[in-house]
Amino acid sequence: MRTLWIMAVLLVGVEGHLLQFRKMIKKMTGKEPIVSYAFYGCYCGKGGRGKPKDATDRCCFVHDCCYEKVTGCDPKWDYYTYSLENGDIVCGGDNPCTKVVCECDKAAAICFRDNLKTYKKRYMTFPDIFCTDPTEKC
């Protein structure tokens, strides 16, 4: 299912903040997010179940949990404002909802950066049918 979602995003073009999130990840990690994170582990990309496979996958789990707390806007499609100041992501704007979304994305991008040393290529295209452990709660 998450493969279809990612392909749909690629075919229609990235709108809203997904492009912003991609840029944040690229800036923090130097990796191309669609290749490196879109199908990583059990939680990166669309959906998620089971137990995160490693620290990078846990970044995605925490990001999903962060999005679950967002109310009043659509975390995947609404634009937010951010800037880079001395290499740091600074979320801005007057809309409290989109600012929270930006903070969720910022935390995930930093988490990916902080866990680059434990990133495992074997989880890059991990089939979600192997995510069979009990699903953790946020």
UniProtKB/Swiss-Prot annotation:
Gene3D superfamilies in the record: Phospholipase A2 domain
Q: Which UniProt keywords apply?
A: Calcium, Disulfide bond, Hydrolase, Lipid degradation, Lipid metabolism, Metal-binding, Secreted, Signal, Toxin
Q: In which tissues is it expressed?
A: Expressed by the venom gland.
Give the E.C. number(s).
3.1.1.4
User: Which cystines does this chain contain?
Assistant: 42-131, 44-60, 59-111, 65-138, 66-104, 73-97, 91-102
| Signal peptide interval | 1-16
InterPro entries tied to this protein:
PLipase_A2, PLipase_A2_Asp_AS, PLipase_A2_dom, PLipase_A2_dom_sf, PLipase_A2_His_AS
Q: Where does Ca(2+) bind?
A: 43, 45, 47, 64
Its annotated compartments are: Secreted
Spell out the catalytic residues.
63, 105
Q: Which GO terms describe its biological process?
A: arachidonate secretion; lipid catabolic process; negative regulation of T cell proliferation; phospholipid metabolic process
User: One GO molecular-function annotation for this sequence?
Assistant: calcium-dependent phospholipase A2 activity
Q: Which domain of life is it from?
A: Eukaryota
Cofactor(s) demanded = Ca(2+)
The cofactor binding remark recorded in the entry reads: Binds 1 Ca(2+) ion.
What reaction does this enzyme carry out catalytically?
a 1,2-diacyl-sn-glycero-3-phosphocholine + H2O = a 1-acyl-sn-glycero-3-phosphocholine + a fatty acid + H(+)
Keyword Calcium present in the record's keywords: the answer is yes
* SMART domains in the cross-refs: PA2c
Q: Name one GO cellular component term.
A: extracellular region
Which PROSITE patterns does the record cross-reference, listed alphabetically? Answer: PA2_ASP, PA2_HIS
Uppermost EC category: hydrolase
Is Calcium one of the keywords UniProt gives this record? yes
Q: What is the similarity comment for this entry? A: Belongs to the phospholipase A2 family. Group II subfamily. D49 sub-subfamily.
Q: What does this protein do?
A: Snake venom phospholipase A2 (PLA2) that can cleave arachidonate at the sn-2 position from phospholipides in the micellar state or in bilayer membranes. PLA2 catalyzes the calcium-dependent hydrolysis of the 2-acyl groups in 3-sn-phosphoglycerides.
One further remark on this entry is: Negative results: does not induce edema.
Q: Indicate what this protein is called per its UniProt record.
A: Basic phospholipase A2 PL-Y
Organism expressing this protein natively: Protobothrops flavoviridis (Habu)
